[in-house]
Amino acid sequence: MKVLEGAVAAPNAKIAVVIARFNSFINESLLEGALDALKRLGQVKEENITLVRVPGAYELPLVARRLAESKKYDGIVALGTVIRGGTAHFEYVAGEASSGLGQVAMNADIPVAFGVLTTENIEQAIERAGTKAGNKGAEAALVALEMVNLLAQIDAA
């Protein structure tokens, strides 16, 4: 039986990180975790990482699509934070970010790792950005690298 499984180390991978500015006090912690994971665990060279800042989580899919269509990147990490408020705005932004990024991955055939926090409150977001619940930015970066390697294995099989 042949087993295909992606590894994390991807020293030659070209990775784009797209990060929302809105809720930057949380997103910057996600970014720190993602960059640390890419460089330290994934062994990705700094010159192979491109950072793109967008206004908010809603804008992540469009920019991710443009990056994917450029064919310059092996994987994309999308980072942002959407915190529930008193209106339906949360559902719209979180839903569009999630489905839009998924569509980019499927249509462009490129790993797009979802590092967008969707939380009930600020405390939950802070916990997921590097305190009690780990750093979801780092987790998303590792997912992107593993998927880059896994897709390469599938292509070579």
UniProtKB/Swiss-Prot annotation:
EC number: 2.5.1.78
One annotated GO biological process: riboflavin biosynthetic process
Active site as annotated: H89
Entry-linked SUPFAM superfamilies: Lumazine synthase (SSF52121)
Pathway: Cofactor biosynthesis; riboflavin biosynthesis; riboflavin from 2-hydroxy-3-oxobutyl phosphate and 5-amino-6-(D-ribitylamino)uracil: step 1/2
UniProt-listed InterPro entries: LS, LS/RS, LS/RS_sf
Source species, domain of life: Bacteria
An example Gene Ontology CC term for this record: riboflavin synthase complex
Job of this protein: Catalyzes the formation of 6,7-dimethyl-8-ribityllumazine by condensation of 5-amino-6-(D-ribitylamino)uracil with 3,4-dihydroxy-2-butanone 4-phosphate. This is the penultimate step in the biosynthesis of riboflavin.
Protein family: Belongs to the DMRL synthase family.
The protein's name: 6,7-dimethyl-8-ribityllumazine synthase
Organism: Pasteurella multocida (strain Pm70)
Species lineage: Bacteria, Pseudomonadati, Pseudomonadota, Gammaproteobacteria, Pasteurellales
Gene name tied to this protein: ribH
